[in-house]
């Protein structure tokens, strides 16, 4: 069974309160999502493999630690996932970025893929899938299905808030994918929106309705 990591760091929770607030404007909302994405990425990448390298400081030579060179890819689920991408890239600027476009059918609530553009060597990369919300789980599950069909194996999912229903569905569908979230909310309402939630992340990021 995959692990669910809920981040209780004070800075994340502080910023998340403003992300949730309906009075937070588009510019501030976008900046906050970017910042929380960066803070979360710090923990999501905690176990990246290191290797020893010999360097010379102004004083002497020494053995230091650097990333072992394992390839990393960030895959935002369009369009809201774009809001978290730059935050992760600020920590790992050499990572490749793929994109998967999905929309939720309002009648069936199922995710439908309309776009996918990924690094050619996606099967060799450690992957962080990002999307601000995990509601029904349909989009995340379909995105990870798409990645696995292309040979991806080492996948993690990162989001701001999640509903218990979505977490359960994700674990049932992909028990090998760890889930990283800033907050686990109460439930989905009758329209499949996370409650208390933060509204529509894509609309709030891009100023659309």
From Swiss-Prot:
CDD domains: PRTases_typeI (cd06223). Allosterically activated by GTP. Its cofactor is Mg(2+). It catalyses: UMP + diphosphate = 5-phospho-alpha-D-ribose 1-diphosphate + uracil. Pfam families: UPRTase (PF14681). Keywords: Allosteric enzyme, Glycosyltransferase, GTP-binding, Magnesium, Nucleotide-binding, Transferase. 5-phospho-alpha-D-ribose 1-diphosphate binds at residues 79, 104, 131-139, 200. Catalyzes the conversion of uracil and 5-phospho-alpha-D-ribose 1-diphosphate (PRPP) to UMP and diphosphate. Belongs to the UPRTase family. This is Uracil phosphoribosyltransferase. It comes from Staphylococcus haemolyticus (strain JCSC1435). The gene is upp.
């Amino acid at each position: 069974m995959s692990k669910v990591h809920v981040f209780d760091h004070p800075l994340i929770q502080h910023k998340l309160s403003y992300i949730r607030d309906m009075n937070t404007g588009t510019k501030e909302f976008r900046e906050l999502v970017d910042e929380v994405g960066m803070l979360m990425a710090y923990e999501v990448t905690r176990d990246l493999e290191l290797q020893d390298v010999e360097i010379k400081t102004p004083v002497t030579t020494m053995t230091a630690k650097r990333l072992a060179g394992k390839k990393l890819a960030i895959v935002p689920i369009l369009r809201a996932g774009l809001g978290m991408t730059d935050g992760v890239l600020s920590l790992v600027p050499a990572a490749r970025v793929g994109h998967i476009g999905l929309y939720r059918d309002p009648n069936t609530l199922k995710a439908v893929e309309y776009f996918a553009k990924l690094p050619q060597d996606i099967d060799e990369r450690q992957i962080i899938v990002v999307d601000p919300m995990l509601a029904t789980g349909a989009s995340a599950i379909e995105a990870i299905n798409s990645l696995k069909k292309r040979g991806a194996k080492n996948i993690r999912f990162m989001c701001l808030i999640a509903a218990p229903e979505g977490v359960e569905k994700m674990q049932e569908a992909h028990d090998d994918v760890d889930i990283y979230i800033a907050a686990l909310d109460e439930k989905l309402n009758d329209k499949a929106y996370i409650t208390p939630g933060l509204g529509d992340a894509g609309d709030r990021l891009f100023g659309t309705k």
